């Protein structure tokens, strides 16, 4: 009973994320591997938190609200989110299946909910059904929210790397910093309140935490819905037509639905950018394309005199 209660929210969220992948479903084997990688990431998280807590106890040997904040934001958040990110990066960055923007959110959530699953099982078996019901609507969806932020910028980092637009480092930093901060603040509000003896402060902290959790859920759902709706191909597939290009080089195009787009797919209806009737190989890098510019290096399509 407790085991089922611990895993029900995990399974529900995984299904929600998976079935919002409209363009191209990810291989089940890859997703299972990511889930178990997330479970494995709890080991470095435990070690990191133990070391961080030992150091913090030396620096601040007494319990206080400030100590709770520091522990949550500077130790718990980084220890858990960096471990998840490393698993995500090692498994998916060079994967041939990572070819659509929404894929990154799917990958990140599967890793994060693997972590959440094993953590939730432990908490539920230690504290009982009340904890199971509370975490079903807070901690487990919270881990999914942190992963949505991570995946959103992880996808942008991959796209920036492929298109060489100079923004990859910034997006990579955001894919780590934002989950760490949102996770750290989530825990800090709780941990700070636990260290306080003032009922008013504890009550205000509880209200702040509830508002923060609701805001996390709303923003994450908006990102999921928009990312799913605007999902676009981000890579060049060997042997296939060009599927990614620099928006500044390729220019805009007007879809049949009337939407003006920069990217490969219409953000409103999902139609693909119209291709030319003929394909060509880039004379500089050899990439196969059906557009007027090479998406790999930006070289314009050769004219008749160059053919």
Show which residues each predicted segment covers.
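Hydrophobic alpha-helical segments at protein termini of multi-pass membrane proteins
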Residues: 1-307
């Amino acid at each position: 009973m407790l085991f089922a209660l611990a895993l029900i929210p995990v399974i529900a969220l995984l299904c929600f994320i998976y079935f919002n992948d409209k363009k191209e479903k990810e291989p089940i084997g890859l997703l299972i591997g990511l889930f178990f990688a997330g479970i494995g990431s709890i080991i470095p998280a435990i070690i990191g938190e133990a070391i961080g807590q030992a150091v913090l106890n030396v620096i601040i040997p007494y319990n206080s609200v400030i100590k709770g904040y520091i522990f949550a934001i500077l130790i718990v958040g980084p220890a858990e989110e960096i471990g998840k990110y490393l698993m995500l990066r090692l498994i998916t960055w060079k994967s041939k299946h990572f070819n659509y923007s929404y894929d990154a959110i799917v990958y990140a959530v599967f890793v994060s909910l693997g972590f959440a699953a094993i953590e939730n099982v432990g908490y539920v078996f230690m504290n009982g059904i009340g904890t199971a019901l509370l975490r079903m609507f807070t901690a487990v969806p919270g881990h999914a929210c942190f992963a949505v932020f991570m995946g959103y910028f992880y996808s942008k980092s991959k796209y920036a790397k492929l298109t060489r637009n100079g923004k990859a480092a910034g997006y990579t930093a955001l894919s780590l910093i934002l989950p760490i901060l949102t996770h750290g603040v989530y825990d800090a509000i709780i941990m700070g309140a636990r260290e306080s003896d003032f009922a008013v402060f504890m009550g205000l902290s509880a209200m702040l935490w509830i508002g923060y959790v609701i805001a996390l859920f709303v923003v994450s759902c908006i990102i999921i819905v928009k990312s799913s709706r605007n999902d676009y191909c981000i890579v060049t597939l060997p042997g296939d037509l060009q599927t990614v290009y620099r928006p500044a080089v390729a220019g805009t195009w007007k879809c049949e639905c009337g939407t003006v787009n920069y990217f490969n797919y219409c953000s409103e209806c999902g139609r693909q950018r119209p291709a030319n009737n003929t394909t060509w190989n880039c004379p500089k890098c050899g990439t196969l394309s059906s557009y007027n510019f090479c998406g790999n290096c930006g070289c314009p399509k050769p004219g008749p005199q160059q053919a």
